Amino acid sequence: MLVETKAKVGVFSIALGAYLPQFPSLVPEFEAQYDAFKKTLPDTVEIIDGGMVTTKEQSQAAGDLFRAADVDLVFLQLLTYATSYNMLPAVKDLDVPVVLVNIQKLKALDYDHTDIASWLGEGYACGAVGEMVADL
């Protein structure tokens, strides 16, 4: 008998929580980027949504959700710089592949008109990978 099942895919995004009070415009920017990323995932998988993580407590909650759902794979979207405490509690003790998704929103920044918030929100994700990979 053939049983149709969907892979359970844990999905979450991370950003450094300290940036958000300093640059409140990042919150809707990051939420929009995370929503857009989730929409790229096919409907042939079951998404277990860990949300946008900016603290170690949120990371732990996402990890608890992933463990309870017994996910098959995790996608982690890097929104901007974040420390390993944003990532590690969510993926520790999971015996599944973890894919770091590091996509810069724009092909190139308009440097003449870029401020700190737009740099952090639209152009810095690629600078965040080193520490994450080292900790994994």
Regions found by a protein language model. Give the residues of each.
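An N-terminal assembly and electron-transfer interface module characteristic of large anaerobic redox
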Residues: 1-136
